[in-house]
Amino acid sequence: MPDVKERAARKEPGAAESASRESRGGNTRESASSARGTDRVGSTVARARPPSPQGPRRGAVKTAPRGPVGHGGLRTGPTSRCPQPSARAKLPSVTRGAPLPPSPGKGHLGGTPSSHRLGMTERVHDASKLDCQLEERSLSSSSLKGKVKDTMPSDFWEHLNEQLSAVPPDFSCALELLKEIKEILLSLLLPRQSRLKNEIEEALDMEFLQQQADRGDLNVSYLSKYILNMMVLLCAPIRDEAVQRLENISDPVRLLRGIFQVLGQMKMDMVNYTIQSLQPQLQEHSVQFERAQFQERLNKEPRLLNHTTKWLTQAATQLIAPSASSSDLQDCSSSAGPSPSDVAVPEPLSPAMVLSQGFLNLLTWDPENEEFPETLVADRPRLQELESQQSQLTILASVLLVASSFSDSGLFSSPQFVDKLKQITKSLVEDFNSRPEEVMQSVSEQVVEEVHQGLESMGLAALSSENTASLVGQLQNIAKKENCVRSVIDQRIHLFLKCCFVLGVQRSLLDLPGGLTLIEAELAELGQKFVSLTHHNQQVFAPYYTEILKTLISPAQTLATKGGSL
């Protein structure tokens, strides 16, 4: 049986293949194989997918000779006797439930109930907000790692090991798993790859495998190697290393488990490419569709923008008469182009400044205030998520700032120590809103312990008893809303988000104010989400915002600013 490296070497050479291979590197997906369409995702995705400039990497290649597997079509075997997972580890179809909306001017929705129109608007709105890059760490319930943990617990794999080790062996669980793996392999193929589809269906013919299992001679190791070789043909360059690592696993159960996990990553690669391919179309259609639907509602309800007008009026008033706490805005500056501190100058006003202040106010919105802007109702769940994320970052940055002020500078110059402390703090502050005092007590204990261990491991001077007690007290005081450190950090994060809205995320990261440098990566993620949400909303409702802001900003102020319009 040829190993993975030999199998990969048998790929047919060609210009497109060479170009794809030469272009690999990092996490960038440059191969069309990373964008494999599936029948499950639908032919719409395949048609919408632009051809890769690198050409097809895999799929039109010859595979190694198959072993003694049977012939025949795909059939299901008898009911498995193995423990059934609560839900199969299948990734949902990207396009189902989120079709490209029709042009708003063609009247496809004319005569339908208003509830149906609102539902369609929300579906289009949600489809346009799909993240361009899904990752395992952000998909605890949708990633393969999460699926294996949730739906195929360790007792399944233990039971599979017991069955294969029995005399005679029981292959019922193995057959179920092979059937699942076969379906995933088929889902990674493009419709035109009929030859590979026929080969997979022939090599993993469930009826023939059931016959082998009944005779007690099902070769699980051989089938695993065949699946591994097929994965070499289908995976994106970024997954080559993971696939080749599986070659060194001799235990059949561990190998099957590894295969199942990597196949899930390959499906995620395909989902990401599909999202990236459809994103521009979804956004373009969404802006037109949402605006047309809102205008239709506005024609029937002339007072529909009352809450939106009040929201923007409050934002403009805040900028004209800023609070004393706004003096901290000067901490944000940038050497590239206009500095973020320029953004915070209260006069002259600009539409962009008022709108950015309005968006920031939504992150501190009183849940009992029912006068939520009508133009942002669909975005309210996402704004609440951003508010929660921003609040946790405020606590995290406050903890790091206080801890660093009591420690030797060399300790917080260690990325390993900072990362460890951040992970510990993040896990503890998840329940901060429900029990702040209790959470901060746990945080103070853990942080003090980590600081002591870090200082000792680096040969630095230990904290005195007095400093330790002071550190614990200041960390626990972060639980209070009026805590000075917490208030300053909160203001600076809000300023950073305002800078992101006006200047962009990258320019806003160039010169972070004190206390935020240790959470730069987390701020970049938060800023990108905030900008993505607010800019889409601005694209949809810019005509309405412009008309409202004309009544709030004098023409002289508008002319005095470069951002005179949205």
Swiss-Prot record:
Disulphide bridges, residue numbers: none
Membrane recorded as keyword: yes
Tissue: Testis-specific. Expressed in mature epididymal spermatozoa (at protein level).
Residue positions where Phosphoserine is found in the record: 103
Pfam families linked: Tcp11
UniProt biased composition (Low complexity): 326-336
Biased composition (Basic and acidic residues): 1-24
Post-translational events: Constitutively phosphorylated on serine, threonine and tyrosine residues within the head and tail regions of noncapacitated spermatozoa. Phosphorylation on tyrosine residues increases upon sperm capacitation within the acrosomal region in a protein kinase A (PKA)-dependent signaling pathway.
GO aspect biological process, one term: adenylate cyclase-activating G protein-coupled receptor signaling pathway
Transmembrane segments: 393-412
Region (Disordered) residue spans: 1-115, 326-347
Superkingdom of the source species: Eukaryota
Membrane topology according to the record: Single-pass membrane protein
Keyword Magnesium annotated: no
InterPro entries named among the record's database cross-references: Tcp11
Compartments, record wording: Membrane; Cell projection, Cilium, Flagellum; Cytoplasmic vesicle, Secretory vesicle, Acrosome
Biased composition (Polar residues): 25-36
Coiled coil ranges: none
Function text: Plays a role in the process of sperm capacitation and acrosome reactions. Probable receptor for the putative fertilization-promoting peptide (FPP) at the sperm membrane that may modulate the activity of the adenylyl cyclase cAMP pathway.
Protein family membership: Belongs to the TCP11 family.
Subunit structure as annotated in this protein's UniProt entry: Found in a complex at least composed of MROH2B isoform 2, PRKACA isoform 2 and TCP11. Interacts with MROH2B isoform 2. Interacts with PRKACA isoform 2. Interacts with ODF1 (via leucine zipper motif).
The protein, known as: T-complex protein 11
Source organism (scientific name): Mus musculus (Mouse)
Taxonomic lineage from the root: Eukaryota, Metazoa, Chordata, Craniata, Vertebrata
